[in-house]
Every structure is written in structure tokens, then in C-alpha cells.
Amino acid sequence: MTIPIVIEQSGRGERAFDIYSRLLRERIIFLGQQVDSNLANLIVAQLLFLDAEDPEKDIYLYINSPGGSVTAGMGIFDTMKHIRPDVCTICTGLAASMGAFLLSAGTKGKRMSLPHSRIMIHQPLGGAQGQATDIEIQAREILYHKRRLNDYLAEHTGQPIERIAEDTERDFFMSPDEARDYGLIDQVIDRHAAGSRPVAMVNQ
């Protein structure tokens, strides 16, 4: 995939940025593919950089992802909780599996979705092969991640853990309005003024 280049004019001449570097200057991070260790390292590095640059300003994490590695995603999640700025999450297109989990992990009141996105939660996927002992070890690990993710989803959404466990047994797709009612996000957004950031409406 060719990454677009942005040319900026200044008194010192022209400067060229790839589009993601230019967005990073505006404190925007784009998670736009399957979550793996390489992507997680990039997202974590950007979060830490923006935290060091200004701990008071919000970070905007746009998510369009089918999910991916649980351990890689948890690295992003832990960093979101570790840094000082609020992390506003915005779903554009699809937030499924770990993508939906990270969407729900944004700062309460600042978790959003564009109106035609889809959001899906389910239990962790995994496969094991080899000797019976190896399969048993992998099964225990999957059950561990399942419990942890369900606990956090219950915390993020306010839903009873029993409902989370039931709903994640199979792929559970939601519209943005349904995800808002479920507690995964706080607001469905359409457009915002030029030069501004999307801001969730928080009930007082």
C-alpha cells in the first residue's frame, strides 16, 4: 500500500510528511489493520511519545480493525491506562474482537463511533496442536484471556459479567447505536467543525 505524502509550505521552505506522521502532530493515531506485535509496538511508541510531549492534551485513537492478537492488544490497552492523557477512541468502519475491546477501553465519555461502523465482540480465538499436555496448556491460556477480557468488558460497559459471557460466546455484532446502549461507546458522531476534534457529549 502506498502511503500518501503531505507537503507543507513554511517560511523555511517545503517539508514532506507521510500522512500518519502528519496526523501524529495533531495527536491522532490510526489503528487500521489486524493487531499484531509489530502494530502494537508502533501504537505503544506513539502513545508514549504523545504522553511525553504533552500529558494534558487528549489523544485520538481511530480504530478500523478486525482484531488480532490478544497479547499484543493488551499491550496497547495497558499503555492506554499507563499514560496520563485521556485517550479518545473513535470507530471508523469496523471494530471487531480486540478492536472492539480497545474501542471500549477509551476514556469514559470519550468513546465514539461514526454512524455506519460495525462493532463486534466475541471470545478469544485459538487453536492448539501437538501433545495432549501442550493442548491443555494452550486451553488454559485461552480460558485465562477469556476471563480477563470478559471482566474488563463488564467494567467498561457496566453490563453484568453473566451477560458479557453469554454475548461473547458467538460473534455479536452491533450498530453504533446498539453499542452505545450496550455501553461499549458513549456517543455516535457524524461531523464536527473544521479544525476541531470530535467531542463526546457527557451527561452531567
Swiss-Prot record:
It comes from the Bacteria. Its EC number is 3.4.21.92. PROSITE patterns: CLP_PROTEASE_HIS (PS00382). It is an enzyme of class 3 (hydrolase). It is found in: Cytoplasm. The active site is at S97, H122. It holds the Pfam family CLP_protease. Gene3D superfamilies: 2-enoyl-CoA Hydratase, Chain A, domain 1. One of its GO terms (biological process) is protein quality control for misfolded or incompletely synthesized proteins. It catalyses: Hydrolysis of proteins to small peptides in the presence of ATP and magnesium. alpha-casein is the usual test substrate. In the absence of ATP, only oligopeptides shorter than five residues are hydrolyzed (such as succinyl-Leu-Tyr-|-NHMec, and Leu-Tyr-Leu-|-Tyr-Trp, in which cleavage of the -Tyr-|-Leu- and -Tyr-|-Trp bonds also occurs). Keywords: Cytoplasm, Hydrolase, Protease, Serine protease. One of its GO terms (molecular function) is ATP-dependent peptidase activity. Its main location: cytoplasm. GO terms for cellular component: cytoplasm; endopeptidase Clp complex. Disulfide bonds: none annotated. Cleaves peptides in various proteins in a process that requires ATP hydrolysis. Has a chymotrypsin-like activity. Plays a major role in the degradation of misfolded proteins. NCBIfam families: clpP, PRK00277.1, PRK12553.1. Belongs to the peptidase S14 family. Fourteen ClpP subunits assemble into 2 heptameric rings which stack back to back to give a disk-like structure with a central cavity, resembling the structure of eukaryotic proteasomes. This is ATP-dependent Clp protease proteolytic subunit 1.
